A protein has these predicted regions:
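Walker A/P-loop
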Residues: 67, 78-99
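Conserved helicase motor core of SF1/SF2 NTP-dependent helicases
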Residues: 330-347, 351-378
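Short, glycine-/Ser/Thr-/acidic-enriched flexible segments
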Residues: 48-49, 79-80, 89, 117, ...
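Short hydrophobic alpha-helical runs that function as membrane-insertion/retention elements
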Residues: 83-85, 104, 109-113, 368-372
Length: 378
């Protein structure tokens, strides 16, 4: 079933990555029958459609979004697997950013990875430059990677620690509209489910139309007459009735079910983010603080940080401060042991990452969102 993986080598330009630990972890998953949905799908073992989970409130940092993008975010949160494809200019990056913010809002940890630095740097740049009342929101996202990226990450963490020192957190005010958000989430989820059904119905209707056109070309074949009558008189009619029953759904219909109080949401992001960063000052983070405050040369600090991150238990502790971690597919192997450490892995430009290397971030997530161009994503 997966015996062939021992022969897969991960090559990335001049980088050779030893994936022995990843392969062993996958084999252990299968032996213990604890295989995640993403790994099942990777090896063609996902033989039935995964069930939906609960409805998650969708949280947006902007309103530059349409129904298809909302559906992508909704499905990424509700299903263990989501495949998002679209050509350049269709809002894939905006969808990724809003998915990450939605995940953060729902206490979901995220590993965002790509084979290339550019897409993940763009997302990191946007997430770290959100503002509330002229102040930068200390959004708890960490960019890791090679030794230089880790040096920058250590400096960035210490800047955030200094920034939030004087911020007072009033926890009771942060969740005062939680029930309203949950109710909106349920209604939006139901509406998006109907929109998804309409897309499916229209696709089936188009297929039937092509079949009927084909029948016209061979209408002399009497043995096909009952089939043609079934298409025209029953199946097409049922599709039309259901489409009419649901009705048209516009972008504005869905947006009305979102929390559109941007001022209040940015306030929530600011203070909730600050609360996450302040967690780093708790006693259980002493080992990490010693690395951050060591005063040693940056390279020594970075190597100590990488050593700290090799242990899964330390990664899980860090996630309580930085629930969103961004890195390349190759550098993801430095994050803990090869096991599902994150609630969700998001992989951008998915097909540009070779098959072997893609396993590194995939194995570290309970769920998977693949994003790419139709000309690239297979």
């Amino acid at each position: 079933m997966v015996g062939w993986i021992r022969y897969v080598l991960g090559l990335g330009m001049d980088v050779v990555l030893n994936l022995h630990d990843e392969y062993k972890a996958i084999l252990d998953m299968f032996e213990k029958q604890q295989v995640t949905y993403p790994v099942k799908a990777f090896f063609g073992e996902l033989l039935e459609r995964p069930r939906r989970t609960k409805a998650y409130p969708i949280a947006l940092i902007n309103q530059n979004i349409n129904l298809d993008q909302l559906l992508a975010i909704n499905n990424a949160m509700k299903y263990p697997l989501a495949y998002i494809q679209g050509p350049p200019g269709t809002g894939k990056t905006n969808t990724i950013i809003n998915t990450i913010v939605t995940a953060f809002f729902n206490n979901t940890t995220v590993l965002f990875a790509s084979y290339n630095n550019v897409p993940i740097d763009n997302v990191f740049e946007k997430l770290t430059h959100l503002e509330y009342h002229g102040q930068t929101i200390p959004f708890p996202v960490l960019r890791l990677g090679n030794i230089d990226k880790v040096k920058a990450a250590i400096s960035y963490i210490n800047r955030l620690r200094n920034q939030v020192q004087t911020v007072k957190i009033f926890t009771s005010t942060l969740d005062k509209r939680k029930d309203d958000r949950i109710d909106r989430a349920k209604r939006l989820s139901a509406r998006l489910k109907e929109y998804e059904e309409i897309l499916d119905l229209k696709e089936r209707k188009e297929t039937l139309s092509h079949l009927m056109e084909y029948q016209e070309h061979i209408k002399n074949a009497m043995n096909l007459l009952p089939f043609q009558m079934d298409l025209q008189g029953y199946q097409m009619q049922r599709l039309d009735q259901r489409i009419h029953q649901i009705g048209e759904i516009s972008d504005s219909d869905a947006l009305q079910l979102l929390d559109r109080n941007e001022e209040e949401f940015y306030q929530y992001l600011f203070y909730t983010s600050a609360r996450y960063i302040k967690t780093l000052e708790e006693p259980k983070y002493q080992e990490l603080r010693e690395i951050l405050d060591s005063g040693e040369n940056p390279e020594t600090q970075a190597r100590a940080f990488n050593k700290y991150m090799q242990k899964s238990e330390n990664v899980k502790k860090l996630q309580r401060v930085f629930p969103v971690i961004i890195t390349t597919c190759i550098s993801a192997h430095k994050i803990g042991e090869p096991e599902p450490l994150f609630d969700m892995t998001i992989m951008d430009e998915a097909s540009q990452c070779n098959v072997a290397i893609s396993l590194v971030p995939i194995i570290r997530g309970e769920k998977l969102m693949l994003v790419g161009d139709p000309q690239q994503l297979n």
